[in-house]
């Protein structure tokens, strides 16, 4: 027979004891820790990592031991463990070995609340919102109950609260491990009953019914149940102490929904045929109206005034991760929700659709392999109405993978049975990059799952706020502002991760404003043109990438032998215009793949000519967006480098040519083109990779080292020119870097030559934003 801890934990006739909690950082266990500390016990706890909750509890007296270790239970009187902790956990095993009494979280909670009039909220879905709402309403009625809810609820202050002066204790009862039967409720609320946690309930719904039935049998006063749920109705409708609620006018408490808004819902409540009044609930959704009706029935039973109930419900704001609005602007909204069961998902999507977004983009993280396996068919029908669905890998929650029960199985099931557009995201760390690059103004992003998927929403919200502020500041609909633009689209080598913020101005004014905006926020800026002579790492570019393109930046004008060109104009365009006006000296530009901006930045060259050989003056912006102009004599230029433009950004330049004739210009142009075609590959490349050493051209050195054709992954040393690395189609930046490093190492070891890269290598090798 199990020991009754009620008297000990409530300090009825006993002194405080030493208690250790295994898994103290979880939302459920942190609440138990808070209650035990309030009761005066000495409490320690361990977990894989600390959280904001553990930091808060430390201030209240918790001894947080950090990661699990056997010695943590030495000298303790009782160990409390969460349902996720099992044999094999070193603290659990040590406590067993020492014979220390051990109880589950639900047993501890039942003991703590045993001296109170307990109100237990049970059901497969909606427990946290309903218990939090009940606590809020009873507070409004000056009953000031103790409470225990399974998530952070800002309006309540904390997830668990002990009030020794109050008779009432409101708690959500967890059914996942059968521990619901530990409670002896005075009032039992049953929201719904469905198949879930089938890793524990091997006999499915039959076994689940038995647990809920026993829970209801132990209720000493009223049972409040939802008649809209067939299983709840089956378990409760014939009980003499049961009160029903729902949308049917035959229910004891029922309602008519008037309006669902983005953050609230209006409905009118009736008791039998009597109108009680109208309520504006501070959270949206039909399912939340049902949760509210359960609380109305409870408060009505406790004799509370309806006006007070309505006021508290209007003031209520939901728990964290329960249709939690992470971000809202005129362009986007991001909603985070804990829903991970098919029924919860359907209800949340229904609520989201009622807000009429232009597109509903859903991100779902399956929770546990066992649930995925047993509910695979139900998941396939849960996402109706979604315009785009992204599915991440399964959040294992400590489970081992099950063959055929992974995220790919859900994706395939959805594709076979629905027309929902679905995409599997295999890398969680870069999931927000994929989603952020997909969404557009007018979209609502709905984040669903019980694991860590909310992190995706938080990262999106962080960066969308910046891009929305930039749009407002620029007030220029022609300037493209996007998140996570894949840089492989903007480099001639066609590799590279995303740009955190991508800005594509077509006017100098917008370019200037963008620089000033990012400068004030201390966000680093890169300016990129056509992306030649550039290798961007796979982790992408943290900060902003500005791509001045089109508009004013593509303008080219001629005055005598002088050509003024914006930085977005291609070198090829300059040569063509020069030829039209019989201006010579630009023929070398014909085969250069870049544009004026990149040429200025790198002092690009060919056929014995460098860019600054022809530059008369440069107009540029500084990092704050101020415009300056300098003569080329005042700008230091070096081989493939112009230091002045490291932290300043060219917007245009004046070039000088010499008088010529079309025939001669055409001849020189063809010679330039022919030479480049014969000596350079046509496959995607960044141009010359290495600077030429003094002793030997880099291409010749690489050829002599027999490294033409050398490859790593999709990156290969060109067979045409040894100083070119080409992308065979699926190269990554790390492939290219590996080839570069192999060449450098061999040159140093075999020839004593230290090669320097001419190509600019920028960005992060790993994901950092």
Which sequence ranges carry the predicted segments?
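A gly/ser-rich beta-alpha-beta helix-loop segment of oxidoreductase catalytic cores
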Residues: 119-123, 572-616, 685
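Anion-binding (especially nucleotide phosphate/pyrophosphate-binding) glycine-rich loop
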Residues: 470-596
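Phosphate/pyrophosphate- and phosphate-bearing ligand-binding catalytic cores of soluble enzymes
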Residues: 483, 621-769
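Structural signature of FAD isoalloxazine-binding scaffolds in flavoprotein oxidoreductases
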Residues: 496, 503-508, 535-554, 601-632, ...
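C-terminal helical cap/extension that packs against the catalytic core
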Residues: 380-441
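Beta-strand->loop->alpha-helix junctions that form or flank phosphate-binding loops
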Residues: 46-47, 65-68, 103-110, 148-150, ...
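Nucleotide phosphate-binding/pyrophosphate-handling subdomain across enzymes
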Residues: 3-5, 10-20, 28, 35-39, ...
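Phosphate-binding loop of NTP-binding sites
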Residues: 11-16, 35-41, 58, 71-72, ...
